[in-house]
Amino acid sequence: MVSRNSDGYFLDPTGMTVPGLGPSFTAAVSSSSSPTTSSTAVAVADVTAMVSSSEEDLSKKIRKPYTITKSRESWTEPEHDKFLEALQLFDRDWKKIEAFIGSKTVIQIRSHAQKYFLKVQKSGTGEHLPPPRPKRKAAHPYPQKAHKNVQLQVPGSFKSTSEPNDPSFMFRPESSSMLMTSPTTAAAAPWTNNAQTISFTPLPKAGAGANNNCSSSSENTPRPRSNRDARDHGNVGHSLRVLPDFAQVYGFIGSVFDPYASNHLQKLKKMDPIDVETVLLLMRNLSINLSSPDFEDHRRLLSSYDIGSETATDHGGVNKTLNKDPPEIST
């Protein structure tokens, strides 16, 4: 059947009715097809979300895998002994501890120190632990060590170049449980009443729970020192000697004033560096004391006994000493 209407006619699928069927049947058909359409829309949304999430994963920076650049090195017994010795001398100055040990880096030393500190705190053996560094704006800043080239001034006419923080003026923990004084103070004459002196004072034994103390001229507060384990007594050979051989030191100083002794320079070359430094320190202090005005009365008293004229030929060193001339060291 051909329609006579010249205008086009667009069929509405929702409102179109089938001949012989009412509009209610058409509505039922449209309602039955709506669940299929909604499920399709949900599936499309899920696919879109998956695609967007995959794009985000690709856009994220890939994390670089962790690689160990250097394998862990175990600490040997000599290295650990040097580490303990450096803790006594430098506290938490890791750069100086690194230079003292020589075979470990600062990172390795700090890691080893952290483990050692935790072990000591748990065991409760009373080992020496250096105090932690305070914050920058702390009321009591961390005490700084005196530089090696800094000379300490003693009140009065005497000058002292001793350095309390130098390793040569400190006892090893197993060598003695006493306080020691520097060779400069030990060589000071009794007429130096205005100079500060440090006397030898015995301390309680380590078994009573007390720790050894180390005295410092810059601070009056004693710092706790601890005793080593028994194993350190067998490892003295590989550890550095920090105590001068005073018998050899004073023997050399006595030979300087002996007119029959010679080859002093050769003897100095054969001595350990710590003994050489102690000899030079004592000789410098002796020359300062002899040239001070306080010694003038003693020099006149000795001159009254005419020691200079009696020993002018046999004991030239004594005569030169009384006349403020430094003794000559023969080579």
Curated annotation (Swiss-Prot):
Work out whether the entry's keyword set contains Transcription regulation.
yes
Q: Which GO terms describe its cellular component?
A: nucleus
Q: Which UniProt keywords apply?
A: DNA-binding, Nucleus, Transcription, Transcription regulation
Q: Where is this region: Disordered?
A: 122-166, 203-237, 309-331
* Species of provenance: Arabidopsis thaliana (Mouse-ear cress)
High-level lineage: Eukaryota, Viridiplantae, Streptophyta, Embryophyta, Tracheophyta
Which SMART domains does this one have?
A: SANT (SM00717)
**Where does the UniProt entry say this protein principally localizes?**
nucleus
GO-annotated biological processes:
circadian regulation of gene expression; circadian rhythm; entrainment of circadian clock by photoperiod; regulation of circadian rhythm; regulation of leaf development; regulation of photomorphogenesis; regulation of photoperiodism, flowering; response to blue light
Q: Which stretches are tagged as biased composition: Basic and acidic residues? A: 226-235, 322-331
Q: Which CDD domains match?
A: SANT
User: Transcription among the record's keywords?
Assistant: yes
| Function in brief | Probable transcription factor. RVE4, RVE6 and RVE8 are components of the circadian system acting synergistically to regulate flowering time, redundantly to regulate leaf growth, and antagonistically to regulate hypocotyl elongation; their action seems independent of ZTL and HY5.
For this protein, the record's Gene3D superfamilies field holds: Homeodomain-like
Give the protein's recorded name: Protein REVEILLE 6
Report a single Gene Ontology molecular function.
Answer: DNA binding
Q: Name one Pfam family in it.
A: Myb_DNA-binding
